[in-house]
Amino acid sequence: MAASGEARRVLVYGGRGALGSRCVQAFRARNWWVASIDVVENEEASASVIVKMTDSFTEQADQVTAEVGKLLGDQKVDAILCVAGGWAGGNAKSKSLFKNCDLMWKQSIWTSTISSHLATKHLKEGGLLTLAGAKAALDGTPGMIGYGMAKGAVHQLCQSLAGKNSGMPSGAAAIAVLPVTLDTPMNRKSMPEADFSSWTPLEFLVETFHDWITGNKRPNSGSLIQVVTTDGKTELTPAYF
């Protein structure tokens, strides 16, 4: 149950990742009720749902759906932020192709699909669902086949959720954010020579999510929002087809 004064309620799928942890911290600091969904607990969250690792999508989806249902009961949430994901490279000839594709599908497609179903059950009317896309996946990604496939599927899912009879609550919005590179400790460690001024600060996305949750400058449902940082300045631009 949300304590008195906790203005809003949010689920963060991937709540122990770099961006997810920042979301949990920022929204708890605003006295919101925030639940983390991840493979490990986030002790800073109001509650945590621990995802059991499995090679069966249906097993994992059923487990998470059941545990979120127990946690929330009849309570609705203002937002579900799916910020789970990861990166793996490799072209179609790579020995690691199958393994990396499997990983990318689990980290991006499974989490996004489960989040979407949770939205149909637990999101308020007029609420917000965000999904984690990628600007690179607007085009071909020959050097990272699995990643591009997974993110492309997330983009398609987002647009489907905005359509009539998608199952989403009335007035709710599904929006995908399409960054280039996020400024995370892991990315800095793996790419120490990179131009960090072209990386998007996590705080920018956290504040963007806050705006959209509170109805400020929220894009239309189905929008694929490119997140591009140049010389330390970040801009949001819709992708059009």
Curated annotation (Swiss-Prot):
Catalytic reactions on record: 5,6,7,8-tetrahydropteridine + NAD(+) = 6,7-dihydropteridine + NADH + H(+); 5,6,7,8-tetrahydropteridine + NADP(+) = 6,7-dihydropteridine + NADPH + H(+)
Any one GO BP annotation for this protein: response to glucagon
InterPro entries: NAD(P)-bd_dom_sf, Sc_DH/Rdtase_CS, SDR_fam
Residue numbers of Phosphoserine PTMs: 170
PROSITE patterns cross-referenced by the UniProt entry: ADH_SHORT
GO cellular component: cytoplasm
Residues binding NADP(+), per UniProt: 11-35
Effect of residue 38 to I: 3-fold decrease in catalytic efficiency for NADH
EC number(s) on file: 1.5.1.34
Reported effect, residue 7 to V: No significant effect on catalytic efficiency for NADH
GO molecular function, one term: NADPH binding
NADP found in the keyword field: yes
In-chain residues carrying the UniProt-annotated modification N6-succinyllysine: 70, 76, 93, 99
Keywords: NADP, Oxidoreductase, Phosphoprotein, Tetrahydrobiopterin biosynthesis
SS bond partners: none
Keyword Disulfide bond among UniProt keywords: no
Active site positions: 147
Enzyme class: oxidoreductase
Sequence similarity: Belongs to the short-chain dehydrogenases/reductases (SDR) family.
Function as written in the Swiss-Prot or TrEMBL entry: Catalyzes the conversion of quinonoid dihydrobiopterin into tetrahydrobiopterin.
Assembly and interaction partners: Homodimer.
Protein known as: Dihydropteridine reductase
Gene (UniProt): Qdpr
